[in-house]
Amino acid sequence: MSVKKAGVLGATGSVGQRFILLLSKHPEFEIHALGASSRSAGKKYKDAASWKQTETLPETEQDIVVQECKPEGNFLECDVVFSGLDADVAGDIEKSFVEAGLAVVSNAKNYRREKDVPLVVPIVNPEHIDVVENKVKQAVSKGGKKPGFIICISNCSTAGLVAPLKPLVEKFGPIDALTTTTLQAISGAGFSPGVSGMDILDNIVPYISGEEDKLEWETKKILGGVNAEGTEFVPIPESEMKVSAQCNRVPVIDGHTECISLRFANRPAPSVEDVKQCLREYECAASKLGCHSAPKQTIHVLDQPDRPQPRLDRDRDSGYGVSVGRIREDSLLDFKMVVLSHNTIIGAAGAGILIAEILKAKNII
């Protein structure tokens, strides 16, 4: 098995640390370059990072010397670069890496809306990576080098939302109305400034800046299609699918919970048992490709009346699986359910790792 060289941008931040933790144990990738701000550049990683993961900093990464986030040095030897950069700096930096011919998998929001950039939840729409694959094949067939490209990871709460929607749409047809109320973990806000302890203890904050808009439009791009030329993405039009989101920050460390109600466009609607069976039988494409991190069970349907719960269910399939419970009829729409996903695994860094595994399986990197 060939091992690919990986770089991490924003390596000292919350998402960057999670990338490092996942990569350090990965049989198919090895960390070759770490990038952070000029304040950290030139230092050993163990001296540059304020490590805040529950697992200790892996010994193999402690003495790696941090570089600035520029496409030079060890970064130029990487097969894939993972970006955990904040959105306020990610745009220009990620663009420079793509222009240098590197494959970038980004957790930042900057390029998610671009028509030719895949926005991917790897257990939901890995087929959108085909747009990048086609570009790479065309360039190579003309005698050129593999071009650089960027693939965006979805917003963390979007990942949990679309996971059960994908198999339902495939089985029962379009969903024309959808509401979700999220209960989002504090880790989703990062380390600094993050969420103040005084704000979140004994409290719920009923506002997360920009989050509701992301949920509403990202869902339509992820569940949407590709144009006839296979070059751009075509989101589901507002006239065909209305999405309404309310987002709340809650005093939970990891795990985003979402209360979803939905209506199918086709009549008659399926039964509750039909919905449960559909979700249980869903196998994501990453599993079929044999990807290392792909969940054995993509969606865990829980029949207990008080599940899923973050503390009990967020780590199913090492955080790559999604749990769905309380599936029942809805008096306003068709069905309602509760969904739980691990926001820093399948909702962030883990999604990036699984995307890279798909790229490797398809020989794109």
From Swiss-Prot:
A single BP term in Gene Ontology: homoserine biosynthetic process
Residues of the signal peptide: none
Keywords: Amino-acid biosynthesis, Cytoplasm, Methionine biosynthesis, NADP, Nucleotide-binding, Nucleus, Oxidoreductase, Threonine biosynthesis
Regulation of its activity: Inhibited by the non-competitive inhibitors phthalaldehyde and naphthalene, the competitive inhibitor 1,4-benzoquinone and derivates such as 2-chloro-3-methoxy-1,4-naphthoquinone, 2,3-dichloro-1,4-naphthoquinone, 2-chloro-1,4-naphthoquinone, 2-bromo-1,4-naphthoquinone and 2,3-dichloro-5,8-dihydroxy-1,4-naphthoquinone, and 5-aminoisoquinoline. Inhibited by vinyl sulfones.
InterPro entries linked to this entry: ASADH-related (IPR051823), Asp-semialdehyde_DH_CS (IPR000319), Asp_semi-ald_DH_pep-lack (IPR005676), NAD(P)-bd_dom_sf (IPR036291), Semialdehyde_DH_NAD-bd (IPR000534), Semialdhyde_DH_dimer_dom (IPR012280)
EC number(s) from the headed UniProt entry: 1.2.1.11
Reactions catalysed: L-aspartate 4-semialdehyde + phosphate + NADP(+) = 4-phospho-L-aspartate + NADPH + H(+)
Pathways involved: Amino-acid biosynthesis; L-methionine biosynthesis via de novo pathway; L-homoserine from L-aspartate: step 2/3; Amino-acid biosynthesis; L-threonine biosynthesis; L-threonine from L-aspartate: step 2/5
Disruption phenotype: Inviable; the presence of homoserine in the medium does not rescue growth.
An example Gene Ontology CC term for this record: cytosol
GO MF term (any one): protein dimerization activity
Subcellular location: Cytoplasm, Cytosol; Nucleus
Family to which the UniProt record says this protein belongs: Belongs to the aspartate-semialdehyde dehydrogenase family.
Biological role stated in the UniProt entry: Catalyzes the NADPH-dependent formation of L-aspartate 4-semialdehyde (L-ASA) by the reductive dephosphorylation of 4-phospho-L-aspartate. Mediates the second step in the biosynthesis of amino acids that derive from aspartate (the aspartate family of amino acids), including methioinine and threonine, the latter of which is a precursor to isoleucine.
Quaternary assembly: Homotetramer; dimer of dimers.
UniProt protein name: Aspartate-semialdehyde dehydrogenase
Organism (species): Candida albicans (strain SC5314 / ATCC MYA-2876)
